[in-house]
Amino acid sequence: MKTFSAKAHEVTREWYVIDATDKVLGRVASEVARRLRGKHKPEFTPHVDTGDFIIVINASKLKVTGNKTLDKKYYRHSGYPGGIYETTFGKMQERFPGRALEKAVKGMLPKGPLGYAMIKKLKVYAEATHPHSAQQPKALEI
């Protein structure tokens, strides 16, 4: 029996919606990354994007455990000498709700063209409304 390998044009993608209210950031991010990659499907193939579309609502209500609201830091650099910027999780959630989740999921996906295609299937919204009702997403409980 030959090993099955999925073809990109044969992959069927579902739409799922996750309510992130009072959920822990890392637990949501790891499940989202798993489903974006397609590892929950029996036809998973490492070199083919077999993942589903994921909509995360209420991203502004994500939680972290312990003191990470103040202690977890995100860094970025302008490219100039001494141009490093640092932001805490609390400030990031206040200013850009959902960006912390996007960064967490992006770090869990492969680096390269396949990973970039996977992250495009993630839709994050700070509030409970989203414009994807036409796709009839199924509720996914984490």
Curated annotation (Swiss-Prot):
UniProt GO cellular component terms: cytosolic large ribosomal subunit
Domain of life: Bacteria
InterPro entries linked to this entry: Ribosomal_uL13 (IPR005822), Ribosomal_uL13_bac-type (IPR005823), Ribosomal_uL13_sf (IPR036899)
Keyword list, A-Z: Ribonucleoprotein, Ribosomal protein
One GO MF term attached to the UniProt entry: mRNA binding
GO terms, biological process: negative regulation of translation; translation
Known role: This protein is one of the early assembly proteins of the 50S ribosomal subunit, although it is not seen to bind rRNA by itself. It is important during the early stages of 50S assembly.
Recorded family membership: Belongs to the universal ribosomal protein uL13 family.
Subunit structure: Part of the 50S ribosomal subunit.
Identification of the protein by name: Large ribosomal subunit protein uL13
Organism (species): Burkholderia pseudomallei (strain K96243)
Gene that this polypeptide is encoded by: rplM
